[in-house]
């Protein structure tokens, strides 16, 4: 829980529609069984990318997003959207920590007006590192989240 929302935080209804689609990088992190996800594991992320994270793991074996990595994605790479495979990636960490150290991934993304899409399924079916990704939310005011139909389109070439 947060006592205050980040200053300048937009709701999903306020964000420009192009925020929810575009070029995405698919980061399958099967090699990180039970380990933190660090910036060096995400070298293929370009500035402005939609980032899709997945792995074959579940439970305690899932890799997790380190708080510093979340802020690196949001503030240095300026990603457009974060998509998380669940199970596969543990992204909501430190939820019981006192503010402002709780939920670092959630804070990094929402504090920088970057939507989080989860739970994504079938990421392991993607065969290309870069795809076109579309995830349009319902246009519902005063909601932090809503249902989406997430679609990844691979290039036929």
Where are these regions (language model features)?
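Active-/binding-site microenvironments in catalytic and ligand-binding cores
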Residues: 1-157
């Amino acid at each position: 829980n947060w006592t205050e929302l980040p200053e300048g935080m937009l709701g999903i209804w306020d964000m420009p529609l192009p925020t929810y689609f575009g070029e995405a990088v698919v980061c399958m992190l099967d090699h990180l069984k039970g380990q933190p996800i660090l910036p060096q594991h995400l070298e293929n992320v370009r500035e402005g990318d939609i980032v899709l994270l997945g792995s074959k793991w579940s439970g305690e074996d899932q890799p997790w997003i380190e708080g510093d990595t979340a802020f690196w994605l949001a503030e240095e790479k300026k990603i457009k959207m974060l998509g998380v495979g669940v199970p596969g990636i543990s992204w909501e960490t430190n939820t019981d920590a006192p503010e402002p150290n709780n939920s670092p991934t959630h804070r990094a993304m929402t504090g920088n007006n970057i939507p989080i899409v989860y739970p994504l399924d079938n990421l392991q079916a993607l065969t290309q590192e870069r795809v076109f990704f579309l995830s349009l939310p319902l246009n519902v005011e005063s909601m932090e989240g809503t249902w989406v139909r997430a679609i990844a389109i691979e290039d036929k070439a």
